[in-house]
Regions:
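Intrinsically disordered, low-complexity proline/glycine-rich segments
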Residues: 1-94
Length: 94
């Protein structure tokens, strides 16, 4: 599954997941957030001080992939930083 770096319909920076947008915006308390169908993916701290995004209480953790690449893990799955077929930066979720 690809999370693509792109633009939303109104010019905002967005990441699309299977055609759905993760929109860059502000949360209710001024924190930076990405919205998925109106839900917030919040920027915060993990249990051990690492940077994490929370989605419905689950953590997307910043870490290292199996081959040393920066990855975000969601329930043990990796979101990998890479290149798309057309040269766009993408994150893949195994």
């Amino acid at each position: 599954m690809y999370i693509r770096n792109g633009k939303g319909l109104w010019g905002d920076v967005a990441y699309s997941v299977d055609g759905q947008y993760l929109r860059y915006g502000k949360g209710l308390w001024g924190d930076v957030a990405y919205t998925v169908d109106g839900q917030y993916v919040r920027y915060g701290k993990g249990l051990w001080g690492d940077v994490a995004y929370t989605l419905d209480g689950e953590y997307i953790r910043r870490g290292k992939g199996l081959w040393g690449d920066v990855a975000y893990t969601l329930d043990g799955e990796h979101i990998r930083h890479g290149k798309g077929l057309w040269g766009s930066i993408v994150y893949t979720l195994d």
